[in-house]
């Protein structure tokens, strides 16, 4: 669900968020900063957003499970990716948190090779993390790549012609083409070593082997692990999931809620400066439930103030919490199902998408519903924090809120405007002034709209959206559902009963595994995360030029998609207004890519 510099050198642009964080301070408050001796031990309890719960443990995520609860709040706690992006108050490659040294990149004969040396990490069973563990993950990925959330045809792993083990700590990947070194990290950052010496099995009772070295064997191993992954009730007891190289091990899990408890991995080889010994991650059904718990029990160490309750921050700080916004590097959107038989032909008309975008009052929503804790989305590259990846054109809003412009667009293309009802196509056809290809006479602008419940700000956005659309004669039938349900539904679907508009209310973060904001998994016609089946040959062509085209190619790509509207752009909410126990240290500054670092947290007396 997340993101992706350009230069021939291996220097990665790390964007400081100083201006961003300074801007957030004006909207934040905090309790007096507690100081005192460090406490050894203790438990930190984290509150997740409503409906976001841990329900996928295998580090080969499917798109519908690519959520914060399954990545930053579980997978990354237990298994570390090869390269880590983000850090306290910054984006970009984090060499300290990465489990491999920067890649040595060479080009020969039109092909790029990355040679990688692993740092001396160990699994929790004492065995070293080796090149074979990386190869194991890679082989399993190839065995079931179509289900992997990061898959785009022709990109990783299709573009790897050779994986060579040089030594237990060194390996190389040769790619079929020439890549910019920094873009290459988009590919390399997706690699996650997993314990071949413990997981390379075809059944629970079978021996560990080297089955993954053949395609047929890799499929069997993947099938076995996928079956184990589906058994949520055994997440905390299955010996497979106890072999980790991350800083935390799962000790307790409630399958019905996704609540999880972790303890420190004593064998963790990476940086860890904190002192807490355990971590609890809790799911909530609504903002109200979380906020009531935060105020009443004091049992939450790291929670949030709902946007709708932003004015109540004083109550939280008086209870000893420090409060600060958590801006994130991402984009937010409403997805359109271009393949829906009833309405796909309508969504394929650019003027319809332009009219809809003109009816979305992003500035108004940020002010009224997010209370200033958000930023607009104008295209496929985040506006905040400012970075060299953002073109000067995409800093401007190509479709500002303008209901009259929306009505004019629809009327000019053959629609009878019915304010408060549903506009009707009265001029079918394919000329510039007709409704467009595939739209019949009498067809109406009436759509089902699925959205995630539980977050009051999202509910208010959707209600305002429905009202604005209605005034222009676009009828929305709202269908609220839990966050996990809405995310799971946002996949390709071509039946008449399928979803039409889908809004899960949270942003697409350019993390994990990305160094610059290449959205190919979302916008390429073969991208596995292209749930709406958007298909634009020009977009595909521009995306194909990103690996070797540098920043000019990235700018051309984003400027095109900003105006083409493969999705409807919505405000990017801050991750949350964080509320942290005043005695819990090491949390701030927060990571714009949504990662957490509880191994560095500690309490003071």
Predicted regions: what is each one?
Residues 37, 354, 366, 408, ...:
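Extracytoplasmic/peripheral linker and loop segments enriched in polar/acidic and small residues
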Residues 45-109, 139, 243:
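N-terminal lobe/hinge region of extracytoplasmic solute-binding protein
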Residues 101-149, 161, 166, 171-174, ...:
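Aromatic- and charge-enriched surface segment that lines or borders ligand/interaction sites
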Residues 117-118, 122, 236-239, 259-314, ...:
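Ligand-site clamp/hinge motif
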Residues 153-226:
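Surface-exposed binding/hinge segments that line
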Residues 261-263, 348-467, 556:
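Append "and occasionally in soluble cytosolic enzymes with long acidic Gly/Pro-rich linkers
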Residues 263-267, 328-352, 368, 394, ...:
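A bilobed periplasmic-binding-protein/Venus flytrap-type ligand-binding module shared by bacterial periplasmic
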